[in-house]
Amino acid sequence: MKKQILQLNLEQTSSAAAEDTNLDCSLAGYDYVLPPERIAQNPAVPRDSSRLLVVNSQTTGKETPPLHQIFRDLPDILRPGDLLIMNNTKVIPARLYGRKSSGAEVEILLLEERKFNCWLALVKPGKRFKKGTQIIFEGLGMRNLGIENSPQYSVASPHQLTATVLETDKATGGRLLQFDLPEGQSLVQLLDKFGEIPLPPYITTSQAADEQYQTVYAEEPGAIAAPTAGLHFTPELLQKLRDRNINQAFITLHVGVGTFRPVEVEDVATHQMHEEWIEVPAATVAQIKATKAAGGRIIAVGTTVVRALEGAAASGNLQEFCGKTNLFIYPGYKWQVVEGLITNFHLPRSSLLMLVSALIGRERLLNIYQEAIASQYRFYSFGDAMLILPEARGVEQ
């Protein structure tokens, strides 16, 4: 069946829930103080040894506190017949270092390929990169070892890359770069030699290897950040889940730079969400519908999966989808597909924090975050996880 290629423009304008309506729509309502030492600089080893905070009741308080478990306990927490939906995107080595013809050093972050070997990129420093500026990139082997000693290079690989600035992108402030390569050769094929895996800006002292910032099921190159809720899974844990009839299905959402950008408008309902490319294949749609028909539950692994599934169901009916979405989920959103969520702990004032608030309520989520901080949980991309079970969500607004 030919895939339906669509362009979603799904800025949600639903009203917030009656309780705490003003704060639900106020940027200040999503603030909290995180001690810097709670920001994880390195991942848990092994992956599934990270902690898991489980929210499994409609209220959270002294009588019904969240459970504190280990991620590898997941097969005993979920039910046979549940379905985990995972994002199989793969982080590309999107950070490149180069220089202008004047010798001035340049750092760029590739955002997306607009057409063959023509990329939108953030450039630092960016003020003087006008149309026609040329940038020269040297491979990591040349920069670190000397090209003749680098095992990363084959005879067919170029020693340098050049790119020309075509224009400034007003929406992102980035530059459109045309890379000059031999006919038929793709920049993506050379990124392992010329680029580095970009880590989030709050990770400053990490010793993690590149593969530790990839999920074990990453297959589709295109992201500039990992879908971090999936970093906790190991092949052995996935097999244990399958052995208990807790199966997995996949979507693809290439995580973009917007995931790190804070919401800046005071009225969050007016926030303009960034676009991200998603694919929800027919096989995944079929698995979801079969799971629901059999009484199983749909558990999203990460906020990227939430956006993909809910975006694909924007018409009211989940369907195969391939295209872009700028879906913004915040309190008051009417859920279509997702019933439970595995997610890491998110930054204050972020759209991701608002998304999770839409599932269980803003005030309640912030109270859970305070308990996580007091209990020494590790936050953000390399941090611990939380599981919101369907029975924790309460009555839909």
Curated annotation (Swiss-Prot):
Q: Which GO terms describe its biological process?
A: queuosine biosynthetic process; tRNA wobble guanine modification
Q: Which PANTHER family match?
A: S-ADENOSYLMETHIONINE:TRNA RIBOSYLTRANSFERASE-ISOMERASE
* Superkingdom in the source lineage: Bacteria
User: Where does this protein act, in terms of pathway?
Assistant: tRNA modification; tRNA-queuosine biosynthesis
KW Cytoplasm (keyword) present: yes
Q: Which reaction does it catalyse?
A: 7-aminomethyl-7-carbaguanosine(34) in tRNA + S-adenosyl-L-methionine = epoxyqueuosine(34) in tRNA + adenine + L-methionine + 2 H(+)
Keyword terms of this UniProt record: Cytoplasm, Queuosine biosynthesis, S-adenosyl-L-methionine, Transferase
The family line of this record is: Belongs to the QueA family.
Which gene name does the record give?
Answer: queA
Pfam families named among the record's database cross-references: Queuosine_synth
Protein name per the record: S-adenosylmethionine:tRNA ribosyltransferase-isomerase
What does this chain do? Transfers and isomerizes the ribose moiety from AdoMet to the 7-aminomethyl group of 7-deazaguanine (preQ1-tRNA) to give epoxyqueuosine (oQ-tRNA).
**Which compartment or compartments is the protein found in?**
Cytoplasm
Q: What class of enzyme is it?
A: transferase
For this protein, the Enzyme Commission number is 2.4.99.17
A molecular-function term among this protein's GO annotations: S-adenosylmethionine:tRNA ribosyltransferase-isomerase activity
Q: What quaternary arrangement does the UniProt entry report? A: Monomer.
Against InterPro entries, the record matches this protein to: QueA (IPR003699), QueA_dom1 (IPR042118), QueA_dom2 (IPR042119), QueA_sf (IPR036100)
The record's NCBIfam families line, in alphabetical order, gives: PRK00147.1, queA
A single GO CC term for this protein reads: cytoplasm
Task: Please indicate if the UniProt record lists S-adenosyl-L-methionine as a keyword.
Answer: yes
Instruction: List all membrane-crossing ranges.
Output: none
